Amino acid sequence: MPKMKTKSGAKKRFRLTGTGKVIAGQAGKRHGMIKRTNKTIRNQRGTNILCESDGRIIRKSFLPNG
């Protein structure tokens, strides 16, 4: 049986750390930023580590070879 292919959308959105945790970009930064404080905008920079249950779903379903 051939290997499962990695979902190309997940490949662009998620990364795996060395310990197997899943890193994703911070959501909610596309529009509507004028209403938010500078502190909120600043805190939304960078990436987040997904919780264990979400990370397990991403690893098994979308990144099978990662």
Swiss-Prot record:
Q: Is Nucleus tagged as a keyword?
A: no
Gene3D superfamilies, alphabetized: 4.10.410.60
Its domain of life reads Bacteria
Gene Ontology biological-process entries = translation
Keywords carried by this UniProt record: Ribonucleoprotein, Ribosomal protein
Task: Extract one GO molecular function annotation from the record.
Answer: structural constituent of ribosome
A GO CC annotation recorded here is:
cytosolic large ribosomal subunit
By sequence similarity, the record places it as follows:
Belongs to the bacterial ribosomal protein bL35 family.
HAMAP family in the record: Ribosomal_bL35 (MF_00514)
Q: Know the name of this protein?
A: Large ribosomal subunit protein bL35
The gene for this chain is rpmI
